[in-house]
Amino acid sequence: MSAEVISRVSQIYGEGITLTPISQGAEAVIFTTTTHPYLPSTEGSSKYVVKYRPPKTYRHPSIDVALTKQRTLGEARLLGKLQQIKGLRVPKLLACDVYNGSIWMEFLGEDLPESRGFSNLKNFLWMCASEPYSPVVEATVRDVGCQIGLLHWNDYCHGDLTTSNIVLVRSGAEWAPHLIDFGLGSNSNLVEDKGVDLYVLERALASTHSAFAEKYFEWLMEGFTSVYQSHGEKGEQKLKELLRRFEEVRLRGRKRSMLG
């Protein structure tokens, strides 16, 4: 990770704020901090996430500023809307600094036991590989499907629905899935977009948990369809149309794989 990026963020928010980089993607760098964006710190146990979009030197400066502002504001607005959906679990938005390209959110998840990594769905399923069909795995994967169903039923799409972008929060013996990273998210009622979301997640499961992926996706889709079916005839009709398009997306993906 670039020391220049870390230095720039420290200059923006002050040397007194401790920012720990935890990951870097093509568009943004993710930090954790114990400093709230605007409230005085009284404890030190709370942790927050700062998603920072650094300037892109390959873009014209004025275009880069405009794009960064647009994408940062767009993601923050989307998170704000998603928080209003009953039952949908996403990070709580705390602050948005569009001029510096950063979003502050609540921190979700924990480190899994025995150094198994962070509690996203990918690492959780790896941790449970010795008992892949246990009740807790089945319940968790079904709940993931319910969360995606809620997202899609309300006409929102994730845009990058991988097992790394589903964080699990422990609640006793259970794990509650939360959807994170809506940088590519959108408000869309197109079955094509929803079908692509499902296909991306199916491929992610197949690539990282190939031995059990078929069963996992079956459970996931049972949770997903239950959301639509709970809305009666209208839900059944929308589900039928979505699943038909999902099969078309699947077929296109297989053809691309065959052609290399």
UniProtKB/Swiss-Prot annotation:
Matching entries from InterPro entries are given as: Bud32, Kinase-like_dom_sf, Prot_kinase_dom, Tyr_kinase_AS
Q: Which GO terms describe its molecular function?
A: ATP binding; ATP hydrolysis activity; protein serine kinase activity; protein serine/threonine kinase activity
Main location per UniProt? cytoplasm
| GO terms under cellular component | chromosome, telomeric region; cytosol; EKC/KEOPS complex; nucleus
Key word Plastid present in the record?
no
Indicate the residues that form the catalytic site.
D160 (proton acceptor)
Question: Which residue range or ranges hold the Protein kinase domain?
Answer: 16-260
Write down the SUPFAM superfamilies for this protein, in alphabetical order: Protein kinase-like (PK-like)
The protein's UniProt keywords, in alphabetical order, are:
Activator, ATP-binding, Chromosome, Cytoplasm, Hydrolase, Kinase, Nucleotide-binding, Nucleus, Phosphoprotein, Serine/threonine-protein kinase, Telomere, Transcription, Transcription regulation, Transferase, tRNA processing
Under Gene3D superfamilies, the record lists:
Phosphorylase Kinase, domain 1 (3.30.200.20), Transferase(Phosphotransferase) domain 1 (1.10.510.10)
According to its UniProt record, the EC number is 3.6.-.-, 2.7.11.1
PROSITE patterns in the cross-refs: PROTEIN_KINASE_DOM, PROTEIN_KINASE_TYR
* Annotated GO biological process: positive regulation of transcription by RNA polymerase II; telomere maintenance via recombination; tRNA processing; tRNA threonylcarbamoyladenosine metabolic process
Where found in the cell?
Cytoplasm; Nucleus; Chromosome, Telomere
Under PANTHER family, the record lists: EKC_KEOPS COMPLEX SUBUNIT TP53RK, NON-SPECIFIC SERINE/THREONINE PROTEIN KINASE
Q: Partners and quaternary state?
A: Component of the EKC/KEOPS complex composed of at least BUD32, CGI121, GON7, KAE1 and PCC1; the whole complex dimerizes.
Q: Which family does it belong to?
A: Belongs to the protein kinase superfamily. BUD32 family.
Give the comment on domains.
This protein is considered an atypical serine/threonine kinase, because it lacks the conventional structural elements necessary for the substrate recognition as well as a lysine residue that in all other serine/threonine kinases participates in the catalytic event. BUD32 has protein kinase activity in vitro, but in the context of the EKC/KEOPS complex, the catalytic subunit KAE1 switches the activity of BUD32 from kinase into ATPase.
Q: What is this protein called?
A: EKC/KEOPS complex subunit BUD32
Query: What organism is recorded for this protein?
Result: Eremothecium gossypii (strain ATCC 10895 / CBS 109.51 / FGSC 9923 / NRRL Y-1056) (Yeast)
